[in-house]
Amino acid sequence: MFSGIGTAIITPFKNGEIDYHALKNFLETQRMVDAIILLGTTGEAPNISIEERDKLIPFVREYFPDKPLIVGVGTNSSHHTMELVKNAEKNKADALLVVTPYYNKPTQIGLYHYYKYISEHTDLEIIIYNVPGRTGVNIAPETVYKLASDCKNITALKEANSSFDQINKVLHLKPETFKVFSGNDDISFQFLASGGNGVISVASNVIPNQMVEMYKNIISGNISNARKIFYTYYPLFKALFIETNPIPVKQALNIMGLIENELRLPLYPANKETKNILEKILKECKII
């Protein structure tokens, strides 16, 4: 499993279809990051068909043959999740990002057996993805580490719970070989300085090199440099979530000339106020 900055990449669209020309140009900006996370929340995974996955995953794999490629496969159905697991295996993913089942609101024991079932039916490494603000369920640190103890291929957690109480508990209890990634750019500096293993980042769609530089400064002990980078881009971190992700990040990348500002319903392009805020911040941060 990687350490460092993994970009949760967008899926660019044009006229309703995946825009592979734009995707190729976008991927070129991502050479410095440590991993690519494909078909997560930022990639609009629920709106991507199996047939599209069969083209999209190999496209990214071919572009970055040696960079870790983690593919999102989580749904609220164990049967459908396993279909996506087998699809990711077939298309040469390195690891799986599996979100906690949304809408169903399972108990901790239900979550345990869900992840255990998946782990028993694949050899790929699994990152548990905890994002209670979207799913309506929070997986407890104790459940995560029981899974890590019982399932050898459950090797990491993406923690997108903004509660520092939970984050501190997660980092305090984690086994030495288990990795924990933040899913929140706006606390990435504090998370990494507290011993986190990396960030699965939305902001690195826009500022990949700067996010990598912040991480490198932290692990080399240059905390003041890392802090300066973090607070330089802190307004961007916040702005990327003033509407539902990935609406703002797609707007930002459109302003930068990298992609069309197109999403699939029920997601809808950013309003004018959001666009103006993003333009202002991108200029202030000298990104455009």
From Swiss-Prot:
The UniProt record gives the binding positions of pyruvate as: 42, 200
Could you name the domain of life of the organism this protein comes from? Answer: Bacteria
The EC number(s) given in the record are 4.3.3.7
What residues make up the catalytic site?
Answer: 129 (proton donor/acceptor), 158 (schiff-base intermediate with substrate)
**Which reaction is catalysed here?**
L-aspartate 4-semialdehyde + pyruvate = (2S,4S)-4-hydroxy-2,3,4,5-tetrahydrodipicolinate + H2O + H(+)
Q: Which SMART domains match?
A: DHDPS (SM01130)
Q: Which GO terms describe its molecular function?
A: 4-hydroxy-tetrahydrodipicolinate synthase activity
Task: Report the CDD domains cross-referenced here.
Answer: DHDPS
Q: Give an example GO biological process.
A: lysine biosynthetic process via diaminopimelate
Q: What is the annotated localization of this protein?
A: Cytoplasm
Which residues does this entry assign to the site Part of a proton relay during catalysis? 41, 103
What pathway or pathways are given for this protein in its record?
A: Amino-acid biosynthesis; L-lysine biosynthesis via DAP pathway; (S)-tetrahydrodipicolinate from L-aspartate: step 3/4
Job description of the protein: Catalyzes the condensation of (S)-aspartate-beta-semialdehyde [(S)-ASA] and pyruvate to 4-hydroxy-tetrahydrodipicolinate (HTPA).
Q: Which NCBIfam families match?
A: dapA
Task: Give the family per the record.
Answer: Belongs to the DapA family.
The record's section on PANTHER family has: 4-HYDROXY-2-OXOGLUTARATE ALDOLASE, MITOCHONDRIAL (PTHR12128:SF66), DIHYDRODIPICOLINATE SYNTHASE (PTHR12128)
Oligomeric state and interaction partners are given as: Homotetramer; dimer of dimers.
Q: Under what name is this protein listed?
A: 4-hydroxy-tetrahydrodipicolinate synthase
Q: Which organism is it from?
A: Thermosipho melanesiensis (strain DSM 12029 / CIP 104789 / BI429)
Q: Which gene is the coding source of this polypeptide chain?
A: dapA
